[in-house]
Amino acid sequence: MLRNDTITAIATPPGEGSIAIVRVSGPDAISISDRIFSGNIAGYASHTAHLGTVSHNAVCIDQALVLVMRAPRSFTGEDIVEFQCHGGYFACSQIVNALLAEGARAALPGEFSQRAFLNGKIDLIQAEAIQQLIAADNIDAFRIAQNQFQGHTSQAISSISSLIIEALAYIEVLADFPEEDIETEDSLPKHRIMEALSITDELLSSFDEGQRLAQGTSIVLAGLPNAGKSSILNALTQKNRAIVTDIPGTTRDILEENWVLQGKNLRLIDSAGLRETENLVEKEGIARAREAMSQAEGILWVVDASQPLPEFPTILYQKPTILLWNKCDIVSPPQIEVPFQQISVSAKTGEGLLELKQALQKWLNTTQLGKSSKIFLVSARHHSLLHSVYTCLTAALNGFTEHLPNECIALDLRQALHSIGNLSGSEVTENVLGEIFSKFCIGK
């Protein structure tokens, strides 16, 4: 990728809006922008804003507010100019065309963030957090990404790296001076490796919880056919997402719907009604329903209050479960003793849905991020590389127990540092960078 040219792109989403932003970055950002602006951008101080007119070939394009950020005190570390013009498509696209005509190049997806990384303004972990911030669809995903962007994850990785480097330096001294009788069983390198292992293990153990928080808590609606599972899904999400009929066995596959409740993300899963059947398609749907129940973090067991009480599967007693007595608008549910919460609802009238939402909110509040700086891994790339670090550190630690040569232990530590380099970006390949930043939007 060329790093000595100047790039431009629209930085705001397409469509109607009050303001659109065109971003320019590179060594000629100021001179190129100056040629299409009525003011004197070349003479403006850094971090100042100026109102003027954007024109090209003697044709006025729009009135715009220009922001000037000079290198190295900018997001990319280069000279940056931003044009804030009227929203919509035409004004910003014509400004981009004018900038291209004056010598700028159209930016690639994520190229502004990539330049920030290459110029040392952010590390790769922080760069990836930018995309996570943009893609966050619930408050927990946003907070996890915000913590990562603020550098909390990077600081933990840096601590691991420092401990490994300290251990490696000590071991290399032992390798260089084998004649010295230095006891290593309880030595500094072993303790440093154990400290690094502890931090690595803590990060790895946060992955499942981080995934749950970012992607949403999975809750299955399960029960007999025609109990009202699909109707309750539609009522909660206020969408006609699931097909509803009076024919038993209408739902024959897993249907998943993301639903944000008070900023928290849930994955509501509608499933096939559980019953004995000879229909091969329905039988497969029931098998998938049971699998979904086994993997879900919670179950809404839906019962038609007007029908005989069905047998409760064992799994209801093994997971957080709420018993939903549906059709309470036409019949009062029976009084039974069960070890989980019971709520009377009506998918038809909406009765009881507020109580159900409040119960679900309590489930979701089990893990509260709040303003905490707790680190959660959510990236599969980060998890894979940290797992490699953990494996190498474990091998190095075992090397002490097995009295392996110091050179072997040092080799494991160097491999751990290599994985950390790939994680932070200090040793990452150009192909990996291309893959990561290609997922970004143009203009970011």
Swiss-Prot record:
Binding annotation for K(+): 226, 245, 247, 250
Residues given in the record as Mg(2+) binding sites: 230, 251
Single biological process term from Gene Ontology: tRNA wobble uridine modification
One Pfam family named in its UniProt record: MMR_HSR1
Binding partners and assembly: Homodimer. Heterotetramer of two MnmE and two MnmG subunits.
Organism: Chlamydia trachomatis serovar D (strain ATCC VR-885 / DSM 19411 / UW-3/Cx)
Nucleotide-binding is among the record's keywords: yes
Organism domain of life: Bacteria
The protein's role, per its UniProt record: Exhibits a very high intrinsic GTPase hydrolysis rate. Involved in the addition of a carboxymethylaminomethyl (cmnm) group at the wobble position (U34) of certain tRNAs, forming tRNA-cmnm(5)s(2)U34.
InterPro entries: G_TrmE (IPR031168), GTP-bd (IPR006073), GTP-bd_TrmE_N (IPR018948), GTPase_MnmE (IPR004520), MnmE_dom2 (IPR027368), MnmE_helical (IPR025867), P-loop_NTPase (IPR027417), Small_GTP-bd (IPR005225)
One MF annotation (Gene Ontology) recorded for this entry: metal ion binding
Enzyme Commission number, as recorded: 3.6.-.-
Residues the record lists as binding (6S)-5-formyl-5,6,7,8-tetrahydrofolate: 23, 82, 121, 444
GO cellular component, one term: cytosol
Localization of this protein: Cytoplasm
Enzyme class: hydrolase
Main localization category: cytoplasm
Cofactor note: Binds 1 potassium ion per subunit.
Binding sites annotated in the UniProt record for GTP: 226-231, 245-251, 270-273
Similarity-based family: Belongs to the TRAFAC class TrmE-Era-EngA-EngB-Septin-like GTPase superfamily. TrmE GTPase family.
Cofactor: K(+)
Domain TrmE-type G as annotated: residue spans: 216-365
Keywords, alphabetical: Cytoplasm, GTP-binding, Hydrolase, Magnesium, Metal-binding, Nucleotide-binding, Potassium, tRNA processing
Protein name: tRNA modification GTPase MnmE
